[in-house]
């Protein structure tokens, strides 16, 4: 309680005795700010007129350091307009002095209960669901699917854009399953060279190929009894897809260089940022393998479709990163919150992580402001419009039509240039995997060479 008249402070303390709460009384704004800095209270009763500063000055100082602490102003009749203005700046309520005991008790009790409920709501929202953060309706549907499917041995096929948390989802499925205490083994089919991925998956014996100095266990054997997660599955070579299908059907496999069959019990979870059925139709993914694995589909929504989850995730990451980097950041400014809500996040949660890491490392303070954000967020004046440009209204002649691969090549090269040669970043904006771009660049180089030979 911040009240400079001792008799009034003593009277109000007696009014609040039945609530069984601890009350600390100070008589100046400076003492109030220092006291709150030492120990954050559950509620502040603040007189509008103080001997050393105004109640509004105290309000601003408190909101700077402890933005979540509720404040109830106490004011005389002539200052009601100021009290209303204070509520616009974050005060929760105001009392007109002199106030009766019942009115004071009800106001204080309601303010404390409201603050406690708000804190519990925030805590509940920020509780991780098996590693996820977010309480949007789209994510609630994901959580329900995980809960329903986790106990089954049926294969789960996770789809979603890059950076949406497909591996987190796979780990959540494993943790919620009966196999949760057994191994979870992940293998990224796009990150391993074609000639090594079979060895990574099934293992190899000594001397199976150059460099195989010792026998090595593969991911399939390591996952025995647990879950085998095949990330970016649609990047797998067709020849290896055949062997994978046999492994799924029989539960047996051979190490590279061995004729001996090994048997394991694994639950398959796989993921891709592509449309798996489209990959089947275009001949890049085996149809029989698709039907074997696409038993329970689970789509992860992009961050832009998750509403205020972006703010929940941002605050969770901010707290972790600030502590890790030894910084004091505790909140986002209102402008940053709005910018985060507007932005389309083409790189999803992974991009949000990178943005916050950049800000925390390169800046100081307690609040993240717009000027701290890296491009393109600090340059946005409106939500990014990622819609494709409209087709040219004028008719084109047949001489102006280019092969589709050349048009695609131009679009990808422009994206790479815009991203300063950073192919993984360009892939994020183009909504494809980096390996897709590398593969296409190689194919186009071969086509250009063929064209030159024809000349």
From Swiss-Prot:
Family annotation (SUPFAM superfamilies): CheY-like, Homeodomain-like, P-loop containing nucleoside triphosphate hydrolases
Keyword Transcription regulation belongs to the record: yes
Disulphide bridges, residue numbers: none
Keywords: ATP-binding, DNA-binding, Nucleotide-binding, Phosphoprotein, Repressor, Transcription, Transcription regulation, Two-component regulatory system
Pfam families reported in the protein's UniProt record: HTH_8, Response_reg, Sigma54_activat
Domain of life: Bacteria
A molecular-function term among this protein's GO annotations: ATP hydrolysis activity
InterPro entries: AAA+_ATPase (IPR003593), CheY-like_superfamily (IPR011006), Homeodomain-like_sf (IPR009057), HTH_Fis (IPR002197), P-loop_NTPase (IPR027417), QS_regulatory_LuxO (IPR053402), Sig_transdc_resp-reg_receiver (IPR001789), Sigma_54_int (IPR002078)
GO biological process entries: phosphorelay signal transduction system; positive regulation of DNA-templated transcription
Residues that bear 4-aspartylphosphate: 47
Miscellaneous information on this protein: In strain El Tor C6706, at low cell density, LuxO acts indirectly on virulence gene expression by repressing hapR This leads to the expression of virulence factors. In strain El Tor N16961, the hapR gene is inactive due to a natural frameshift mutation.
NCBIfam families noted in UniProt: LuxO_transreg_Vib
Physiological role: Involved in the regulation of different processes depending on the cell density. Acts together with sigma-54 to repress, perhaps indirectly, some genes.
Name assigned to this protein: Regulatory protein LuxO
UniProt lineage: Bacteria, Pseudomonadati, Pseudomonadota, Gammaproteobacteria, Vibrionales
